[in-house]
Swiss-Prot record:
Gene Ontology terms, MF aspect: rRNA binding; structural constituent of ribosome
PANTHER family according to UniProt: 30S/40S RIBOSOMAL PROTEIN S3, SMALL RIBOSOMAL SUBUNIT PROTEIN US3
Residue ranges, annotated region (Disordered): 233-252
Protein name, entry field: Small ribosomal subunit protein uS3
Entry keyword set: Ribonucleoprotein, Ribosomal protein, RNA-binding, rRNA-binding
Keyword Ribosomal protein in record: yes
Function: Binds the lower part of the 30S subunit head.
Domain called KH type-2: residue spans: 16-85
GO CC term, one of those recorded: cytosolic small ribosomal subunit
Family per record: Belongs to the universal ribosomal protein uS3 family.
GO biological process: translation
HAMAP family: Ribosomal_uS3_A
Gene3D superfamilies, alphabetized: 3.30.300.20, Ribosomal protein S3, C-terminal domain
Length: 252
């Protein structure tokens, strides 16, 4: 069934992600993306240190490609490595930074505030760091540290907020680190900016003066043909009037 195929592909993607996270922990693994092409399967790996992903002479990336083909049944896998532009805005990288600092014995509050300062200095709108486990005493507890503005629920939280998770084994027990970051380029639906109208100077059209035409300037052209036509019309009228008078005299 189609539903089973979706679940199967999701499990395979999760297994690949966990393998790459374990393999490339020192390289600053920041996530991966899988693209299926007609040629094969493209696996894009995002890392803070791409040189460590490639390895000397491409040794590490060849080993990863071989493992993806044999253990995860990927058809003709091709691994592409991309460097993370701003590691401080990648929650997975920052979660592993918290792990490294806790393993060095630093106090969890100091670690959380240090990471928050780094993330906010990179331009993030908001950040939340959650450390849970045996952080104080023998009982499990949860400590949350946040700064700025970050969405907690709804579609904007799913669509815009980036999340990262990591675990660390310490002497008291296992701690879970959860980092959520609101990137600087996110524009929320309820963020409305009203721009001020532009003031444009419009020049009023200057009315042109129309020269007055005086009666003395209006002159009609009278040609010789017009005079002849008028004379011929007058002679015809006279002839007609004479004929009418003759008829009237005869009737009398």
């Amino acid at each position: 069934m189609i539903e089973k195929d979706f679940v199967k592909e999701g499990l395979k993607r999760t297994r690949i992600d966990e393998y790459l996270e374990t393999k490339l922990e020192r390289a600053g693994y920041g996530g991966m993306d899988i693209q299926v092409t007609p040629v094969g399967t493209m696996v894009i790996v995002y890392a803070e240190k791409p040189g460590m992903v490639i390895g000397r002479g491409g040794k590490t990336v060849r080993a990863i490609t071989k493992t993806l083909k044999n253990n995860f049944d990927l058809e003709n896998p091709q691994v592409e490595v991309k460097e993370v532009d701003v590691p401080e805005l990648n929650p997975r990288i920052m979660a592993h930074k918290v792990v490294a600092m806790l393993q060095r014995g630093m106090q969890f509050r100091r670690v959380a505030y240090s990471i928050i300062r780094r993330i906010m200095s990179a331009g993030a709108q908001g950040v939340e760091v959650t450390i849970s486990g045996k952080i104080r005493g023998s009982r499990s507890a949860c400590a949350k540290f946040n700064e700025g503005y970050i969405k907690k629920c709804g579609e904007p939280s799913i669509k815009y907020v980036k999340e990262g998770f990591a675990t660390v084994q310490l002497k008291p027990g296992v701690l879970g680190i959860y980092v959520r970051i609101m990137p600087p380029e996110v524009t929320l639906p309820d963020n409305i900016e009203i721009s001020e109208p532009e003031i444009v100077d419009v020049e009023e059209p200057v009315a042109q003066e129309v020269p007055e035409v005086q009666e003395s300037e209006i002159v009609e052209e009278i040609t010789g043909e017009d005079i002849l036509e008028e004379l011929s019309e007058e002679s015809e009228i006279e002839e007609i009037t004479e004929e009418i008078e003759d008829v009237e005299t005869l009737e009398e």
